[in-house]
Amino acid sequence: MIVGNYGIDFLPREGDVRDYNSALILGADGQRVGRYDKIHLVPFGEYIPYKNLLFFARKLTGRVSEFTRGDQRKVFRLGSPQGGAHRYGVFICYESVFGNEVREFALLGAEVLVNISDDGWYGDTSAPWQHLNMARMRAIENRRWLLRDTNNGVTAVIDPYGRVRQSIPRHAIDALPAQFAFRSDVTFYTAHGDLFAWLCAILALGTVALAGRKLLRQWMASSQVQKSQV
């Protein structure tokens, strides 16, 4: 079982308490397997950037913006009804937006991806559907099944080709029995991240630079011809 959790660490030596936006992983026996603390926090929603400069923001956001950033991506081994254990990569809400970060779970050996999300912030807008489509991209990039569980968004089972195989409508309280498979192959994107995109960007900039240089030479040559005619 994987559930959203308010993680708390007590640090008696420092006299401090740290709060985390966490996912708690429980085994079939009900015992705790581990906890994942969200790493990519939402600015002003989960933490205040540049606290010293934006000191007034604390009064506006309250305690909701005091989460501590997690420091490690983890993959959890859970038993299967068919026997054996499989590796799950669990990430939280907004983290599904960042492909270069989600791929690290696959690199760590995750055979299936799990995204738990609170989409209640968005209301009845297109945002929950956009969030779903971003999760579909993560499934395609890493060629993994992706199980998406939301409180008020689109709960869905997504296959490695980004197709939504099963889903629960928004605002519905329901359970979704799902069939999915475990995969361990490594895609180009999983291995290299946004390398291809960066190469395309460099190629595009180089093409623009060469075209601009050619136009500049033509303009200079035309200017010289006009001056010589005068």
Protein language model features and the residues they cover:
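Enzyme catalytic cores with a strong preference for nitrogen-chemistry domains
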Residues: 1-230
